[in-house]
């Protein structure tokens, strides 16, 4: 008879969880940020609100975003006029879109990740699917399993309604799954479509306008497992540790409520201040065991909630401007895609590191940090170790 200890030992992987492939996808409809205020106020029948439009124009100008991608185009919005109002019953129409489109966009990203990984999809043992766009049963995880033709025995975890920190959460969960299940290969998918949050402007809730200026659609997929098969699987980053915390005195700073009118977001003005004030504590706790206290010695992946968050974190930690290059690049090219952002940034970083002939996937640096920020205020902190580029 074997003992529980022997079974337990046999179940565990030897090495750390490793990112082995990354894929991303966006809808075809690209929106230019410079002309977006004109389009937004026209499509929502709000052109008479001239002062509000000027405010929105300033928000868009300050957003540091050049373009975004959105499933919602003029045709779809004209068919669903209630989505263009500020507070009209529209959840059914929104759900009809996202329940179908979220798994589809997720599939596009997953297909790219599986291709890069180079292994048959039958070897995927676990699926973690994350979205803040809509809710359904069976979930988007089930729909994606069908769309990809994964094995019916794939072990699924569906994360709905987490918000912008969840790109860190999925890495934390995938790390535990990979390291505690020998041979596990975890497909992680974050897919976000703003059809659930899009709404017309109002004078009374300017925080809602902030979201309209920042949010974009996108999906990212990664494959994570321990003990990569030599010559077959190519490691990109190792996941060394992962932590989650709720910031003190931050209740109500970022809230989202799913109602008849869709998903409404509410932000307090001091979100950037709350994050920047507390970010060093999370860094210290994560990197003290490694003997690292110079934040400029790390490579950086931070959820780009908005430019003010990045500016204040940069200032608070005296980061060199190049530290947030990959993060700002993704914000500029795609906007805030909620949970998918940090995975887009990981992809951008490894791509640019190789292109620039650097020694590692982490901009030539050995150790790095990935931050997710979102409702709660919740912060996810993931310690990454880069891999040498041959």
Curated annotation (Swiss-Prot):
InterPro entries in UniProt: Chalcone/stilbene_synt_C (IPR012328), Chalcone/stilbene_synt_N (IPR001099), Chalcone/stilbene_synthase_AS (IPR018088), Polyketide_synthase_type-III (IPR011141), Thiolase-like (IPR016039)
EC top class, as a word: transferase
Gene3D superfamilies: 3.40.47.10
Matches recorded under Pfam families: Chal_sti_synt_C, Chal_sti_synt_N
CDD domains, per database record: CHS_like
Task performed by this protein: The primary product of this enzyme is 4,2',4',6'-tetrahydroxychalcone (also termed naringenin-chalcone or chalcone) which undergoes enzyme-catalyzed or spontaneous isomerization into naringenin.
PANTHER family in alphabetical order: CHALCONE SYNTHASE 1, HYDROXYMETHYLGLUTARYL-COA SYNTHASE
Protein name per UniProt: Chalcone synthase
Species this chain originates from: Hypericum androsaemum (Tutsan)
């Amino acid at each position: 008879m074997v003992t529980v200890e022997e079974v337990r030992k046999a179940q565990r992987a030897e090495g750390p969880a490793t990112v082995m492939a990354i894929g991303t996808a966006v809808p075809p409809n690209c929106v230019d940020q410079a002309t977006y205020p004109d389009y937004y106020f026209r499509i929502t029948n709000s052109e008479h609100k001239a002062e509000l439009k000027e405010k929105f124009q300033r928000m868009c100008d300050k957003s540091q975003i050049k373009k975004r991608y959105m499933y919602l185009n003029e045709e779809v919005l004209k068919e669903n006029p209630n989505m263009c109002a500020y507070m009209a019953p529209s959840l059914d129409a929104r759900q009809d879109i996202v329940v179908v489109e979220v798994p589809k966009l997720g599939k596009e990203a997953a297909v790219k990740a599986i291709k890069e990984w180079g292994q048959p999809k039958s070897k995927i043992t676990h699926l973690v699917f994350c979205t803040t766009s809509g809710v359904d049963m069976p979930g988007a995880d089930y729909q994606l399993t069908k769309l990809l033709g994964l094995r019916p025995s794939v072990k699924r975890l569906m994360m709905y309604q987490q918000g912008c920190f969840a790109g860190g959460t999925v890495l934390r969960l995938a790390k535990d799954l990979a390291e505690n299940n020998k041979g596990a290969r975890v497909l992680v998918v974050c897919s976000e479509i703003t059809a659930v949050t899009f709404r017309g402007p109002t004078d009374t809730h300017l925080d809602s306008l902030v979201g309209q200026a920042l949010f974009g659609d996108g999906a990212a997929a990664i494959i994570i497992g321990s003990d990569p098969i030599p010559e077959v699987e190519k490691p990109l980053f190792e996941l060394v540790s992962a932590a989650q915390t709720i910031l003190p005195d931050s209740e109500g700073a970022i809230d989202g409520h799913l109602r008849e009118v869709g998903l409404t977001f509410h932000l307090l003005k001091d979100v950037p201040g709350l994050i920047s004030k507390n970010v060093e504590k999370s860094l210290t706790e994560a990197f003290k065991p490694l003997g690292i206290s110079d934040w400029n010695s790390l490579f950086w992946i931070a959820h780009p909630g908005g430019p003010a968050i990045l500016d204040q974190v940069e200032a608070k930690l005296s980061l060199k401007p190049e530290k947030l290059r990959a993060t700002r690049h993704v914000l500029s090219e795609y906007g805030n895609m909620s949970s998918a952002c940090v995975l887009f940034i990981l992809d951008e970083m490894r791509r640019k590191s190789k292109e620039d002939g650097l020694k590692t996937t982490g901009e030539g640096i050995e150790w790095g940090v990935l931050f997710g920020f979102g409702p709660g205020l919740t912060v996810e902190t993931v310690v990454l170790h880069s891999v040498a580029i041959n």
